[in-house]
């Protein structure tokens, strides 16, 4: 399809118009103009379909509702086809923007609807939280139901009377406080009024009698000094009374504490006698002050070696793990009858026990040997001293006889 030149097309239109004007001799009517323009546009559109705008005549009329003639469905008059093509592109852009605006408006309306629904639901929930929903669940009881086991009508009456008495006491206390506050306020007002009167009289007297005021000032100072002395004496007396009260209270507390302590000391031995001992009884300790504590070996708990050595000294069996509550005689009788009192299931524990017992036995043997040696030495020394005394005694007698 050959290209169309826009300049030649516009020149043909202008020439045809001039011919019509010259032939008629009068200005053409708007209807003739429109018909001529319509015919030109139709012929142009028939010949050149590729350059026709993408909308119909009705769409253009709807876009431009008010034309120059006042009718709504007429096309605008383009004097140049280039302007018509540019107008078509702008109209397509307008349609696109119009479509986007409609979508945005619809989304905004949906959001407003959702927001209003949410606010409505929120208000409804707040109302339900405050007032409740009796259609869903019943109203809560105004007064709690009392259980028959826990509360009885007598107890309820006592509680009511107690509450009434407490309320009456509180009301009476409040009434007393109000009375005292009123009396204090009245006294303050009287004092203020008397001070004001005294000031007025003093001002009037000062103008008339200055000498008498000086004397009265001296008298006032003396009175004030006397009052201060009295107050000081009263304070000192109060302090002394407080000190004496404190001392008397302290002494009474001490006496009561001493009485209580004596009572507790008297009661403690009785309690100790009545208490039953748990476990095997420890043998009586046979130790002298001269003997020093022996070392029973290593790997022993503090006091364990001495406790085990006491059993060995008394000639009793050392109690083992699992034998609490039995005496050594009972343990020995059970072992003689065939019971295994301390098995060898835990080999390491059994080895530790045997090592400790051997340490105690060896230490006890050493102690026994040491004591035996000491006893033998003492016997020898005593024998030597006795023989020496006899010899001295004999010699003294012989001298006396001579």
From Swiss-Prot:
Its main location: nucleus. Residues 1-10 have a biased composition (Polar residues). GO terms for molecular function: chromatin binding. Residues 206-217 have a biased composition (Acidic residues). Residues 1-56, 105-290 are annotated as: Disordered. Residues 23-36 have a biased composition (Low complexity). Residues 176-200, 222-245 have a biased composition (Basic residues). GO terms for biological process: cell differentiation; regulation of gene expression; spermatogenesis. Coiled coil: none annotated. Pfam families: NKAP, Nkap_C. Transmembrane segments: none annotated. One of its GO terms (cellular component) is nucleus. It is found in: Nucleus. Keywords: Differentiation, Nucleus, Phosphoprotein, Spermatogenesis, Transcription, Transcription regulation. Residues 105-129, 246-255 have a biased composition (Basic and acidic residues). InterPro entries: NKAP, NKAP_C. The modification Phosphoserine is found at residues 23, 148. Interacts with RBPJ, CIR1 and HDAC3. Transcriptional repressor of Notch-mediated signaling. Required for spermatogenesis. Belongs to the NKAP family. This is NKAP-like protein. It comes from Homo sapiens.
């Amino acid at each position: 399809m050959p290209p169309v030149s826009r300049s030649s097309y516009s020149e043909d239109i202008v020439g045809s118009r001039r011919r019509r004007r010259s032939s008629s001799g009068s200005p053409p009517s708007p209807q003739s103009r429109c018909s001529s323009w319509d015919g030109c546009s139709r012929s142009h559109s028939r010949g050149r379909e590729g350059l026709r705008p993408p909308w119909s005549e009705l769409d253009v009329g709807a876009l431009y509702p008010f034309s120059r003639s006042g009718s709504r469905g007429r096309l605008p008059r383009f004097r140049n086809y280039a302007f018509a093509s540019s107008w078509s592109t702008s109209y397509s852009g307008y349609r696109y923007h119009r479509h986007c605006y409609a979508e945005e408006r619809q989304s905004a309306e949906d959001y407003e609807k959702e927001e209003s629904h949410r606010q409505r639901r929120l208000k409804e929930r707040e109302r339900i939280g405050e007032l409740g929903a009796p259609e869903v669940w019943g109203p809560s009881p105004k007064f709690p139901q009392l259980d028959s086991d826990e509360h009885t009508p007598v107890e309820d009456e006592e509680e009511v009377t107690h509450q009434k008495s407490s309320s009456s006491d509180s009301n009476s206390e409040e009434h007393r406080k109000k009375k005292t506050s009123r009396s204090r306020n009245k006294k303050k007002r009287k004092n203020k009024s008397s001070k004001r009167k005294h000031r007025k009289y003093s001002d009037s007297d000062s103008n008339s009698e200055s000498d008498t005021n000086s004397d009265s000032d001296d008298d006032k100072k003396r009175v004030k000094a006397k009052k201060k002395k009295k107050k000081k004496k009263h304070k000192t007396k109060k302090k002394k009374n407080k000190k004496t009260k404190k001392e008397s209270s302290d002494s009474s507390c001490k006496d009561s504490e001493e009485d209580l302590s004596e009572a507790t000391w008297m009661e403690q031995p009785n309690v100790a006698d009545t208490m039953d001992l748990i476990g095997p009884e420890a043998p009586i300790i046979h130790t002298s002050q001269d003997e020093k504590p022996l070392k029973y070996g290593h790997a022993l708990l503090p006091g364990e070696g001495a406790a085990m050595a006491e059993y060995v000294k008394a000639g009793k069996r050392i109690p083992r793990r699992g034998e609490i509550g039995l005496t050594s005689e009972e343990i020995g009788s059970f072992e003689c009858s065939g019971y295994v009192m301390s098995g060898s299931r835990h080999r390491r524990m059994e080895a530790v026990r045997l090592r400790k017992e051997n340490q105690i036995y060896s230490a006890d043997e050493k102690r026994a040997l040491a004591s035996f040696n000491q006893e033998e030495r003492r016997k020898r020394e005593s024998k030597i001293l006795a023989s020496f005394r006899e010899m001295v005694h004999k010699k003294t007698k012989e001298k006396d006889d001579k």
